[in-house]
């Protein structure tokens, strides 16, 4: 509910200010499980992509967004939780396994999840080697993977 309210409020503002150029939305299924895999250039990627995709996108977001100290950390955590984002521990091993299982559960419920296969933002705009979690989720769930290229964000 908060997701749709924020989306309805922000879309006109962001579209009029930034004029995003979007093509290929026909490849995003209207219902059912799907994985949107994108490069990650800036924090704004996580704002723009869900706004232009016509259905809810649940991101697997780094756990630090949910545990930062102070008022800024509290606000960030509240926003991410309100938008239904899921914390991911990127330290590897069993901790990362829990994130994969959460992603698989969401996909089994018909969710559309967003993931940045590189695992973090690119410091220089280049595409870096992706991690294997997205391939594992796609293979185990049978969800289609929709590649996305974010440019000039």
Language model segments and positions:
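Soluble catalytic domains of membrane acyltransferases
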Residues: 3, 7, 14-153
């Amino acid at each position: 509910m908060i997701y749709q309210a924020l989306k309805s409020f922000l879309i006109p503002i962001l579209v009029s200010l930034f004029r995003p150029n979007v093509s290929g939305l026909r490849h995003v299924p209207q219902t059912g499980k799907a994985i949107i895999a994108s490069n990650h250039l800036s924090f704004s990627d996580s704002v723009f992509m869900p706004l232009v995709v016509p259905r809810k996108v649940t991101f697997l977001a780094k756990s630090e967004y949910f545990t930062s100290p102070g008022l800024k950390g509290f606000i960030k955590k509240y926003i991410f939780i309100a938008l239904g984002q899921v914390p991911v521990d990127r330290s590897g091993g069993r901790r990362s396994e829990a994130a994969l299982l959460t992603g698989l559960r969401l996909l089994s419920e018909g969710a559309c999840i967003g993931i940045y296969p590189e695992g973090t933002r690119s410091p220089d705009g280049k595409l870096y080697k992706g991690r294997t979690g997205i391939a594992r989720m796609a293979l185990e769930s049978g969800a289609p993977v929709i590649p996305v290229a974010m440019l000039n964000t």
